[in-house]
Swiss-Prot record:
PANTHER family: 4-HYDROXY-2-OXOGLUTARATE ALDOLASE, MITOCHONDRIAL (PTHR12128:SF66), DIHYDRODIPICOLINATE SYNTHASE (PTHR12128). GO terms for molecular function: 4-hydroxy-tetrahydrodipicolinate synthase activity. Keywords: Amino-acid biosynthesis, Cytoplasm, Diaminopimelate biosynthesis, Lyase, Lysine biosynthesis, Schiff base. The record marks 47, 110 as: Part of a proton relay during catalysis. The active site is at residues 136, 164. This is 4-hydroxy-tetrahydrodipicolinate synthase. HAMAP family: DapA. GO terms for biological process: diaminopimelate biosynthetic process; lysine biosynthetic process via diaminopimelate. Homotetramer; dimer of dimers. Pyruvate binds at residues 48, 206. The gene is dapA. Pathway: Amino-acid biosynthesis; L-lysine biosynthesis via DAP pathway; (S)-tetrahydrodipicolinate from L-aspartate: step 3/4. It catalyses: L-aspartate 4-semialdehyde + pyruvate = (2S,4S)-4-hydroxy-2,3,4,5-tetrahydrodipicolinate + H2O + H(+). It comes from the Bacteria.
């Protein structure tokens, strides 16, 4: 079953920079730290990985490096989103070529296609690349919201296997579970509501917070997957302020600030994202302390 392969806590990895370039040494160390922390998969070059400000060459290199470093220990779901269908196909083909286990394709942004346009976008990728494809729905960033009716149609295609749902709307998951069938993989894209998402039948979370706290995020998700809700609630209470603190400024700047405090990478981000504002740093540090990180 696809669900047995893609589940649990799956960090949306940051892309570390140093002196304006991708810091490959730091990236490899981040991958190793996540795997040692017990995560169940990895997502390179997603939103948190600043894919929109990576060159195509950098994007491809980060995917290759993630696959090589992971060496099959956990599945790699490579970011392959674009508002150009042809470009998304190209990125998905590259992900398959270098050995990624799946790709994550955000709904087309800026050009704001209709529901039929989104269906045809994903169908074209499905037809072009034999690789598991996750739909990524994040209307707060893209300006479009893929409907459950469209997802039901997409679920009938052989390579469209599931969704990363970053809407935070927990009512959607029950309908998706009923409409898309038992093989449909449902991954939350919202750390703060992941507990509820799992209780509604979800299979995991593509997590920002795991960049900072992989051990705690893994413990939380293991509890949820085992139906140990009291234990899951313990970890939820310990992590919830950190979940929120990592979005007190434009992401991933707060996450990189937190990681820099742990000596994991620099704070460097690429414009138009700027370094985490001084005014929110104390709240991030306090949330880290509450999560047992300082």
């Amino acid at each position: 079953m696809v669900q047995s392969h893609f589940k649990g806590v799956i960090p949306a990895l940051v892309t570390p920079f140093r002196d304006g370039e991708v810091d490959e040494k730091a990236f490899v160390a981040l991958v190793e730290r996540q795997i040692a922390g017990g995560v169940h998969g990895l997502v390179p070059v997603g939103t948190t990985g600043e894919t929109s400000t990576l060159s195509h060459e950098e994007h491809r290199r980060v995917v290759e490096l993630c696959v090589k470093t992971t060496a099959g220990r956990v599945p790699v779901i490579a970011g392959a989103g674009s508002n150009s269908t042809d470009e998304a196909i190209e990125l998905a083909r590259h992900a398959k070529t270098v050995g990624a286990d799946a790709c994550l394709v955000v709904t087309p942004y800026y050009n704001r296609p209709s529901q039929e346009g989104m269906y045809q976008h994903y169908k074209a990728i499905n037809d072009a690349v034999e690789l598991p494809i996750f739909v990524y729905n994040v209307p707060g960033r893209t300006g479009v919201d893929i409907s459950n009716d469209t997802l039901e149609r997409l679920a009938k295609l052989p390579n469209i296997v599931g969704i990363k749902d970053a809407t935070g709307d927990l009512t959607r998951i029950s309908f998706q579970r009923l409409m898309c069938g038992p093989e449909w993989v449902m991954l939350s894209g919202d750390d703060p509501t992941a507990l509820g998402y799992m209780a509604h039948g979800g299979h995991g979370v593509i997590s920002v917070t795991s960049n900072v706290a992989p051990d705690a995020c893994s413990a939380f998700m293991n509890a949820c997957m085992q139906g140990e809700w009291e234990k899951g609630l313990y970890w939820q209470d310990r992590l919830v302020r950190l979940h929120k603190a990592l979005f007190l400024d434009s992401s991933p700047a707060p996450t990189k600030f937190a990681m820099a405090q742990l000596g994991l990478c620099t704070e460097d981000v690429r414009l138009p994202i700027t370094a985490c504002a001084e005014g929110v740093r104390p709240a991030i540090l306090e949330a880290m302390r509450e999560a047992g990180l300082r």
